[in-house]
Amino acid sequence: MHTIAREPLAFAPVEHRFEGHAYTLGIEEELMILDAQSFELVNAIEQMLEAAPIGEIKPELMESVLEISTDPCANMTEAGEQLRALRRRVAATAAGKELAIGSAGTHPFAMWEDQRIVARPRYRDLISALRFVARQELIFGMHVHVGIDDPDKAIHVANGMRIHMPVLLGLSANSPFWRAAPTGMASTRTPIFRAFPRIGIPPSYENWEDYERRIEFMINAGVIEDYTYLWHDVRPHPKFGTVEIRVMDSQTHIEHSLGLAALVQAMVKELAEHFDAGRRLSSYPWEMLDENKWLAARHGLEGELVDLPSSDRVSTRALAWRLLDRMREHATDLGAVNELDAVEELLTRGNGAARQVVVYEANHDLREVMAEIVAATLA
């Protein structure tokens, strides 16, 4: 039998902007659009877009969700000023429509069946492709972009961040309720989003060329349109020249958003310097990365994770303290060490999920939980 020689598939390079200033920062938050009295979700994104300055608010999949995002910022001070101003302005826009905004990983008592899909081709195509999986994606996340000045370095940083996704999730978990009931999860957002394809802890890439070839293979196969259809917890973002961290629930208190962003920025700096020094990353089984993520989603800071270098079970809180202490020097270099005080507060007073549960346990009233979320979102 003769085999037919085949030409290798041609792969077009993925255009990128990994060439600017390192450690620039961008923060994105997905927020709820609410009735100001009942705190129920309202399908009002078009009203908000009409009333807000162009570009200040962006739509998401559902009409009851909006996104705000900072510009690429030189440092945490600039990012904090922008994010605070954005929350204030969006809240004022909402108030003018007898609406309010709130920030958490899920709405405690909303039903996805009541939400309308935004009339944009990308979202209609997403519903057509994913059906129920996309229709029930009524969740709210926070994304942090950190600038990287070299494409191979971006891959190294993204690979190195994978092991830390569970700790970041434990710190940020802020969604213990879903469809008017406690779920027993610290981050209910996580299993809801897990139903999507191309999600969760990503694969490890050898270098930028390996990433390019694998992305282009999927595009040529017709399964994705471009790399933005990979919704992994951490990913290179070639268009922006950043590494993007996507694992975290939206934070109710803006100080926690900024503290977590400062922590991420410091972690990226550590890994970028690791690359510059020619050091290699330790390799751990993907199954254990994924297991740790599940444990963080289930228990938040109250459980244990597997410390992968030692294979020992260690409290999530202890691992988070260890990470935080190691990042202080990097955050100091970046002018962001004061923002880490908010991460300390998460560790000492509890994350958003724990705080929601405390409010709920007083009267078992989820509207009280939402009232607390709305008030704290604007504090």
Where are these regions (language model features)?
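Short, flexible active-site-proximal loops enriched in glycine and acidic residues
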Residues: 58-61, 94-107, 132-139
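Short, low-order "capping/linker" segments at domain edges
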Residues: 112-124, 183-199
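Acidic, His- and aromatic-enriched active-site or binding-groove loops in soluble protein domains
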Residues: 120-140, 204
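Helical (often loop-to-helix) elements that flank the catalytic cores of nucleotide-handling enzymes
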Residues: 120-127, 148-169, 252-268
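Coil-to-beta-strand transition motifs
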Residues: 137-139, 152, 238-242
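An acidic/histidine-cluster motif and surrounding catalytic segment
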Residues: 144
